[in-house]
């Protein structure tokens, strides 16, 4: 029977199995929702897994306050349309310190507003399992991470002390205070994600489609002028370099730390065609991935997504 399933249907079945397994095994799971394409697919799979019932766990967005405005609008729209139980957490310490990606840099901003914010939220609500939309093809540290990624009481990941995973057998045993991060999309590729979005008609943030947008090139990265806050941190010379270009985003994060790519892809079929030809990583536009060699693995060791 499995042999008759298409590649995408096999991936779908595997992901749904993982999601149901976690819901059955753990006392208090949560699904992390970053509003991006992978989160959209993961949420769609979770709704399928428990249809016609509602999700048996909440959805959580760790908000840095620097997401694209279109992402916030899309999030609120999805929550209303799907009737999601959404938890939003913003690190109050980061807010009190006025942490932002311009003044404090990408590494500190990510550590305080994302990593520490996530750890605060997990501790506050006592979650023992957290679904994430990471895929192994995205980045080398994610390539070696298990589907069930064990975290100690401080939410730290030890890549040298991972549990074996044989076929579809997962070890979910944790002691009090420990937890796991679960990655149901581990075996999907970026192309798989886009083909599934197309076939299933999954709604996504419009930023993924090419359009004329105001951008400025900084250190080889096209940064979109999303709101007035960025203008406060640009010199007059930099402001004079703001131009309109037809761009889209392959990955979405905090807008000052996420680069656009020039593109003509205005539809899902265009994007899929582009994916068949591209030879660059989707995360090439993520500034945080360039903080230093092994920066992503170090972030994950400290508790990052």
Curated annotation (Swiss-Prot):
Top-level lineage group: Bacteria
Role of this protein: With CysN forms the ATP sulfurylase (ATPS) that catalyzes the adenylation of sulfate producing adenosine 5'-phosphosulfate (APS) and diphosphate, the first enzymatic step in sulfur assimilation pathway. APS synthesis involves the formation of a high-energy phosphoric-sulfuric acid anhydride bond driven by GTP hydrolysis by CysN coupled to ATP hydrolysis by CysD.
Catalysis performed (reactions): sulfate + ATP + H(+) = adenosine 5'-phosphosulfate + diphosphate
Family, similarity comment: Belongs to the PAPS reductase family. CysD subfamily.
Keyword Transferase: yes
Name listed for the protein in its UniProt record: Sulfate adenylyltransferase subunit 2
InterPro entries, per database record: PAPS_reduct_dom, Rossmann-like_a/b/a_fold, SO4_adenylTrfase_ssu, Sulfate_adenylyltrnsfr_sub2
Alphabetic keyword roster: ATP-binding, Nucleotide-binding, Nucleotidyltransferase, Transferase
SUPFAM superfamilies recorded: Adenine nucleotide alpha hydrolases-like (SSF52402)
């Amino acid at each position: 029977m499995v042999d008759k399933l298409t590649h995408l249907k096999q991936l779908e079945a595997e992901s749904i199995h993982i999601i149901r397994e976690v819901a059955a095994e753990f006392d208090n799971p949560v699904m992390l929702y970053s509003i991006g394409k992978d989160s959209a697919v993961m949420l769609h799979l979770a709704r399928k897994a428990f249809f016609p019932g509602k999700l048996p766990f909440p959805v959580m967005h760790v908000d840095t306050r620097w997401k694209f405005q279109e992402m916030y609008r899309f999030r609120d729209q999805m929550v209303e349309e799907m009737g999601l139980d959404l938890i939003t957490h913003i690190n109050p310490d980061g807010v009190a310190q006025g942490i932002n990606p311009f003044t404090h840099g990408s590494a500190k901003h990510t550590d305080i507003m994302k990593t520490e914010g996530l750890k605060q939220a997990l501790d506050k609500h006592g979650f023992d399992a957290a679904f994430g939309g990471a895929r192994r093809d995205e980045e080398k540290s994610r390539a070696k991470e298990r589907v069930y990624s064990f975290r100690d009481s401080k939410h730290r990941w030890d890549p040298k002390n991972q549990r074996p995973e044989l076929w579809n057998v997962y070890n979910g045993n944790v002691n009090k205070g420990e937890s796991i991060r679960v990655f149901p999309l581990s075996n999907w590729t970026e192309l798989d994600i886009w083909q599934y979005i197309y076939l299933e008609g999954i709604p996504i943030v419009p930023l993924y489609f090419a359009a004329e947008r105001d951008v400025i090139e900084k250190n080889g990265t096209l940064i979109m002028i999303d709101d007035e806050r960025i203008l406060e941190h640009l010199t007059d010379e930099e402001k004079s370099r703001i131009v309109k270009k037809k761009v889209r985003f392959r990955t979405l994060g905090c807008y000052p730390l996420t680069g656009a790519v020039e593109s003509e892809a205005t539809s899902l079929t265009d994007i899929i065609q582009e994916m068949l030809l591209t030879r660059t990583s989707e995360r090439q536009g993520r500034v945080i991935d360039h903080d230093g060699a092994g920066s992503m693995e170090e972030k994950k060791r400290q508790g990052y997504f």
